Amino acid sequence: MARWRRRLGVAALGAAMLASLAPAARASLVITGTRVIYNAGSPETTVKMSNEGQAPALMQAWIDDGNAEAKPDEVQVPFFLTPPLARVDPGKGQTLRIFFNGYPDGKTLPSDRESVFWLNVLEVPPKATPEEGHGVLQLTIRSRLKLFYRPKGLSGNPLTAAADLTFKRKPNGVLEVHNPTPYYVNLQKLEVGENGAHGSKTPWMLAPLSSDELRLKGTGAKSVQYWAIDDFGGVTPYQAAIAD
């Protein structure tokens, strides 16, 4: 889950959504889970959050298709959620309800593999009190969670899809990683050789039924170690041989 922050001044809430990527600040709104799975045919899926801070928080939520800079009203996605805007008081919770309603132009998603979108949650702190003064720094915090749309009838088990990855050394000093499954495989980290001496990548999302590449350092590595994140945010270590 990625988090963004920026200075909040007189600008409207919409301008705050154009936050640039920066180190994470401490968020009052705590979201349950690190990713969202929408199973095709389900009437809805939900995302829960709670305000663990000391002050009310204004929350705005929307879904994008991967363009983090797009404004909510500029994005066309086959989902809608409610509520898109809410006040969450300290110690209270809020549930986002996400519904699949298809594209307005009738475009369909692939039925043989997962599709990925992003859930955005923007947290805006309350205005500074007179006691705090007008010079106080206020930060908006934007969290982005992957939202996977999972069609019915996909083969295999999404919880063990990472075990099916294959690795091949190509003549040009590149490691080819192939994901033969219909699921996205999310790697927390991949290392080639001891402690990544021959190459590493952190993090890495491998699209279904496709291949990606990593430039290698040297030619001596015989295996890779990688750590995969499952639907529930758990991390499982794997090791696999590199084919020549």
From Swiss-Prot:
This is Chaperone protein FimB/FhaD. Gene3D superfamilies: Immunoglobulins. Keywords: Chaperone, Fimbrium biogenesis, Immunoglobulin domain, Periplasm, Signal. GO terms for cellular component: outer membrane-bounded periplasmic space. Residues 1-24 form the signal peptide. Belongs to the periplasmic pilus chaperone family. It comes from Bordetella pertussis (strain Tohama I / ATCC BAA-589 / NCTC 13251). It is found in: Periplasm.
